Amino acid sequence: MSEPKTASERYQKISQLEHILKRPDTYIGSVEIQEQEQWIYDEETDCMIDKTVNIVPGLFKIFDEILVNAADNKVRDPSMKRIDVTINPEENFIEVRNDGKGIPIEIHEKEKIYIPELIFGHLLTSSNYDDDEKKVTGGRNGYGAKLCNIFSTEFTLETADPKNGRKYVQTWENNMNVCHPPKITSYKKGPSYTKVAFKPDLSRFGMESLDSDILGVMRRRVYDINGSVRDVNVYLNGKPLKIRNFKNYVELYLKSLEKMRKMDNGESDTTPSNIPTILYERVSDRWEIAFAVSDISFKQVSFVNSIATTTGGTHVNYIADQIVRKVSDILKKKKKNIKPYQIKNNMFIFINCLIENPAFTSQTKEQLTTRVKDFGSRCDISSDYINKIMKTDLATKIFEIADENANNALKKSDGSRKSRITDYPKLEDANKAGTKDGYKCTLILTEGDSALSLAVAGLAVVGRDYYGCYPLRGKMLNVREATADQILKNAEIQAIKKIMGLQHRKKYEDTKSLRYGHLMIMTDQDHDGSHIKGLIINFIETSFPGLLDIPGFLIEFITPIVKVTITKPIKKVISFFNLPDYEKWREEESHKYSWKQKYYKGLGTSTSPEIIEYFSNLDTHLKKFHALQGDDKDLIDLAFSKKKADDRKEWLRQYEPGTVLDPTLNEIPISDFINKELILFSLADNVRSIPSVLDGFKPGQRKVLYTCFKKNLTTEKKVANLAPAVSDYTAYHHGEQALVQTIIGMAQNFVGTNNIYFLKPNGAFGTRATGGKDAAAARYIYTELNKIARKVFHPADDPLFRYVQEDEKTVEPEWYLPVVPMVLINGAEGIGTGWSTSIPPFNPLDVVNNIRHLLNDEEMDDMHPWFRGWTGTMEKIESQRYRMYGRIEQVGPNTLEITELPARTWTSTIKEHLLLGLGGSEKVKPWIKDMEEQHAETIKFIIKLTDEEMTKTRKLGFYERFKLISPISLQNMVAFDYRGKIKKYDHVHEILKDFYEVRLEYYQKRKDYMTGRLQWEAEKLSFQVKFIKMIIDKSLIVTNKPKKQLISELEELGFPRINKEGKPHFGKIDEEVEAIISEDEDEDLEESEEATRKKDKDDESTVNGPEELFGTYEYLLGLKIWSLTKERYEKLLKQKQEKETELENLLKLSAKDLWNNDLDDFLTAYEDFQKMDLFLRNSAVPKTKGGKRKRKGGDDDDYDPSGKKKPARRIKKIKKEDDFDRILIKPQAKIKAKRPVKVKVEPPSSAASTPSVKEELGVSDVTSNASTPSTTIFDQKVKQENSDESGISAFSSKFNKIASAFDEDAPLDQITSEDTSVKESSAPAAKKKAPPKRKAKVVESSEDELSDANLSEQDDEEVVPVRRQRSSRQTAKKSYAEPIEISDEEDFIDDDEDEEVDSDESFNDE
C-alpha cells in the first residue's frame, strides 16, 4: 500500500493555465467524443442536414471562438468586407482571416508588452470589461481566442496596419506555454487584416485527426457566419460561399426538410419538390426572423451577435411566445381545444439578433439568459406577419394533430354491445338491446321528459322487447366545430354512445355490433323539433361514418300539426301533418261540414290515448330517412359548419316561402329534410330579427301593435299588464319579458330612437343618457296608442291582410301596409342567422315627397339619414356612407362646450371618455383640466383644458379627440320583401320602390273591397226593404210556418244568404249542407247569450260550419219587430240611396287618389305629432304614477285594494292650438357644406374674423339633419281647403248619435220610431267600457243599420268615411294645421285613470 498523502500534498495551487488544461469542461465544454444531434452542411446536396454526429464539443468551441472574433470585428469596423476560413484536415491546420481594422501594434502603457501579445497570450485580458459600455459583440469574458491558443500545439497571430506601417507576427507553442518573440516588420501597402492560424492539440481531445463529423459541423459554422453577418463575403478553403443574406441561409434548412419529407413518404428524389414556404422579415437593424412549418417538433436556429445559440434561450422564447399567443387567439375562434404546445411543436423559427452585453449559461454560449428588458431593442411581431403564417399549412397540421388527440380522447368514452346498462335511470331499455338481436331494436329519442312518458305509453302497443326510450334534455350539441372537451362533457352525447353502443369514428357497414340497430327521433312538430333532428343527423354524420349509409337506420316519428273534428253530418277526425294541406282542405272541403280544429304545437298536446292510436298506426307516423346520397354530406356541412356562413346566407335567401316537406313520402331524402324543413328553423330566427320591408316591423312589434289596435288602446295601460295581454291575444311563445322590452322600445322618444313612436311613453321609458337602459320597471310605466298610429296604419286596410293562425287563434297579419314606409322612417337593426341588417331612419317629409314623386311618375329626390330632434351634422362621404358629427364650440381661451353628440352615441359613453381624460389611468395621462355637466333635455358639457392640451387638441382635431364623430352606412340594408324572401337593398330608393308597388296594389284592393262592400251593403238593404215591404203587404207570411219551408220560399223569391263577411250567396244549396246550417241555427237559438259567451271563452276550438261560406238569412229573420214599421221601411230606402251615392263617389277615385288623401291626413297628424312630441320632451314633470303606488303598498305592489284612492294629479287642459305654440320651436338651420372636424374653433371674441367653413374647406355634399322644408309646419297655420265636416268630423258626429241612440240589447217595448231622431252625445267617460271595436267600413252609416240584430252580432265594424278628393293636391312641402282640443277623456291624466289602469276589463271583454 502507498503511504497516505499529507495535507500539503492534498491541497495544491496551480496556475490558471494549468486549471484550464486540467478542467477544460468549465471553459470549452467536454473534451470527450459525444453523440449529438447537429445540423451539418452537406456539400453533395448543398443543404443543411439534421444528423447524429460524434464530435468533441471542446474542439468545436475553440474553432468557434476564432470565428466569432472575426465576426465581432464587423461591429468594430463596419468597413470590413471579407472573412477567409481554411480548414486542412490532412495537416491538422485551421486558419481564419478577416480584413478591416486590425489590432493596435503598440506597447501597453501599464503591462509593458505589445497589445497583440497581451490579448492572445495572457489570460483575463479583453476590451469587454467596461459594463457601462453597451456592446453587441460575441466576446464577453476575456477567454475566447486564448482558449484556442491553450488547446493548440501551435498558434500564430498575424495582424497588419498600413496606417502605422507595421505588420505583427507572433507564435505560441505547446498549449501557450512557449511564447516566441513577435516579428514586427514594415507594412506600407496592402489592406488591414488579422489572421489567426492554429493546430489543435488533438491528443487532448482523444482524436488523431479531424474526421468528417467535426468537419461537417465546422463547415456549417462557416455558413452560419456567412448568413448572420451582413455585408461580408465569406470564403471557405478559397471558395466563396453563395449565401448573400439571412434568408438565403434559411433556405438551406428548408431543402433538408423537403428531403426528409420525401424519405418519410417513400418518394424518390425525382418527385417534384414542395419546399415549405419561408416567411422572412427584417424587423429592424438588430432583428431578423424567419418562419417555416415544422413536421415533427419545435425547431430553432438562432444567433446572438453571431454566436450560434444551439439550445435557444430567452430570445427564442421571446419570439416563439409571441407567435404562439397570436396564432392561438386566431385558432381558438375556429377550434377551442387548441393548446399552445400544439402550435409550438409545428414551428421552425430562425432568429438573427444583436443583444447588448449578452449573458449565457456558460462559456460555451449555447443558451442566452439575458432578460428581455435588457436586450436593448424590441421585436414585435406584426399582425401582417401573423396573417402570413396563417396562410401556411400550420393551421391544418395543428388541427390534424388536435383532431387525432381529440379522437383518442373521445374513444375512451365509446360504448359497447352489452346486455345491461345501469348508468341511466331514465332509460327505458329494450329487452333485446345488447343481445344478438340488438340490431333489430329501435331506440326512441324524445324531446324532454314529458314526451318520454308519451313514448312509454306507446310501448304498450309495440312492446318492450324491440323498443327502448330515452329523453333528450334540450338541444343536442353541434359537434361539427365542438371541442373534444365539450363533447366529453356533453351528457346527451355520451349517453347516446353508451346506450347505442357507438364507437367514435368507426366506419360502420352494418349495425350488428350495436345495442340498437335503429334510432328513432320523436320531437315536437315545430322549428325547434326540426333543429333537434338536424343536430342528430349532424352528430351521426360527423362522428360515426357509414351509419347514415345504412338504409332504415335513422327514423322519425311524426305527429299531426292540426286535427279537424267533423261533427255534422258525420263524425270523423282528420289529421294534417302540415299547414298547407290543412289550408287546402279548409278552402275546398270544409263548407260541407260542421267542424272544429285543434292545433298541436308539441308532443305534450297529445293525450295518452292519442299516442296509443299513433303507435297502433306506425305506417302513417314512422318516416325513414333515406341513406346518404349525392350532395347530402355537403348540405349537412352547409347547415352546421361555421365556415359556411356566406353559403348559408345564400341558401336562406333562395328559399321560396310555402315550400314544405311532402308528408306522403315514406322515405325522406336528407337533402329534402334540410332544404324544406330544417331551413325553416334558420328562417324563423331571421324572421324574429329582420323586419319586413312593408311595415318595418319584426313579429314582436307587430303583435304589440295588433293588440293595441284590437283593444283600441286609447287610454293608458300599465306595461306590465299590456305584455301579458299581447302574449294572450297573439299566442306569443318567447316570454313576456321580451315583449316588455319591445313595448318599451316602441314607446321611447328620446333623440336617436323612433322618428315616429306609435305608443306614448307615459313614464320613465329611458333616456339618452344610457340609450334607454335606464327605463323603469314595467310595473311602474304606462302606455297607450298615439293618435298618429291609425293615420299610418289605416283601419280600412285591415280586412285586406292575411292573418297568422296560432293556437286556434287568428292573430296579427303577416305584415301591415302603412301609408308611409316605416322601415325607412324609423329604420331597423337586427342580427339573425347568416344575415344582419342596419337601415338608418329618414325624414318622414322626405319620404312623403318621394312617394308623391312616384305617384306623379317623377324622379325621386335623394334622401339622407335623419333623426328626430337631433341637431348635429350629417356628412355624405360616399354614395352609401355618411359621417355624423356632434357639436362643439370654443367659448373661452381654453374652454370648450359640447352641445350635441352623434346620433345614438349616448351621453354616458362620452362622459366615460371625458372622465378618463380628467382622472387618467395606468395607460392614459390626464389631459382635461376640469369638466362640468349642465344637461337638461339637451346635451351640454363644459370642458377646460390647459394651454398645452388646447394646442394639442387643435392639432388632433376637436371632433376626433372628443369622439364626436360616428359613421353610418347604407351598405347592409336587409329586409324581408313582400314575398317573404330575404333581400339586400343597395339603395333606399329600392326600398321605397318595393314598398310603393305593393302599397299601390293594395290601394286598388282597398278600393275593390270597399266597392264590393258597398255593393253588398246596398243589395242587403234592397233585400231588407223588399222583405219588409212583402211582410207589410202580406205577400210573405213568416209566422207559424216551418223553418225549412220559409227558407225554401226565400230562395224561390231570390233572397240571398249573407255570410259574416257580408257576401251574398244566391240560389239553393245541398240539402245536407242546409241541414247542417239549420241545425246549427237551432242550437244557437236554444243557447242563452250568457251560455254562448261562456262556451266561446272556455272552448279551445271554435266550431266552424258551411254558414261561413254560404251565410244565413239572419239579416232578414233576425230583424227586430219594430223594424217592420213604416218609418223603418222609409229609413231603409234612404240608407240604400246613401250607399249608392257613396259607391258613386268611391268609383270616381283612383288608387292614387286614395293614397294622396291618406298622405294628406298623415301630414296633418304628423304636424300634431311633432307638436305633441316637443311638448312631451320639454315637459318638466314626466308622467308616471308608479311611485305613488309603491309607497301605498309593498315594494312590488302595484295596487293596494285596502288603501283609499286619491284623485290623480291633473294637468291643465289644452283647449287652444296656441297652447302648443307657447313652446318655442326654433327652426333648425341648415348646416354649412363643410366638414366640421376641420373647422378651427375660435373663442366668441374672434368669431367675426374666423373664416367660414366653406372658405376654409371647400367641401360640399353635406346634408343637415337639422334642415327643414321651405315652408315649415310650425311657421304658419294654413286652413284646409275642404272642411272636415264632409269627412271624419261629420261622420263621427253621426256615428255618436247612432251609438248613443240604439242599444242592441234593448227590449222592443223601449224602442219606438221617435228614437230614430236623437241628439249628438258626447264621448263616454274614460272609466266607461268602450264600445266594441268594429271592422273598417267605408261609408257613413245610419241609426237603422246599427240596429240590425244581424249587424250587431256579426259586423262589429268601425265605419271609415271616403274622403272627398281635394280640389288642389297637398304635398309634403305644404303643411296643414288644425286646432287641437283635448277633452276630459283625452287629457294627459284622467280623473278616473286609477280605476281604469287597475282594471283588465277592456282586455278581457271580447
From Swiss-Prot:
Which amino acid positions bind Mg(2+) 2, per UniProt?
D524, D526
Annotated GO CC locations: DNA replication termination region; synaptonemal complex
What spans are recorded as compositionally biased (Acidic residues)? 1079-1089, 1341-1359, 1381-1406
* Binding site residues for Mg(2+) 1: E447, D524
Q: Where is the composition biased (Basic and acidic residues)?
A: 1090-1100
Q: How is the cofactor bound?
A: Binds two Mg(2+) per subunit. The magnesium ions form salt bridges with both the protein and the DNA. Can also accept other divalent metal cations, such as Mn(2+) or Ca(2+).
Record's keyword terms, sorted: ATP-binding, DNA-binding, Isomerase, Magnesium, Metal-binding, Nucleotide-binding, Nucleus, Phosphoprotein, Topoisomerase
Q: Which residues does the annotation list for site: Interaction with DNA?
A: K475, N478, R648, K649, K698, Y732, W906
User: Where does the Topo IIA-type catalytic domain lie?
Assistant: 690-1159
Q: Which reaction does it catalyse?
A: ATP-dependent breakage, passage and rejoining of double-stranded DNA
Question: Which residues of the sequence carry a binding annotation for ATP?
Answer: 69, 98, 126-128, 139-146, 363-365
What residues correspond to the site Important for DNA bending?
I831
Q: Where does the protein end up?
A: Nucleus
Gene Ontology molecular-function annotations: ATP binding; DNA binding; DNA topoisomerase type II (double strand cut, ATP-hydrolyzing) activity; identical protein binding; metal ion binding
Identify which residues the record assigns to the active site: Y780 (o-(5'-phospho-dna)-tyrosine intermediate)
Job of this protein:
Control of topological states of DNA by transient breakage and subsequent rejoining of DNA strands. Topoisomerase II makes double-strand breaks.
What does the annotation say about its assembly with partners?
A: Homodimer.
- Quote the protein name from its UniProt record: DNA topoisomerase 2
What species was this sequence derived from?
Candida glabrata (strain ATCC 2001 / BCRC 20586 / JCM 3761 / NBRC 0622 / NRRL Y-65 / CBS 138)
Name the gene for this chain: TOP2
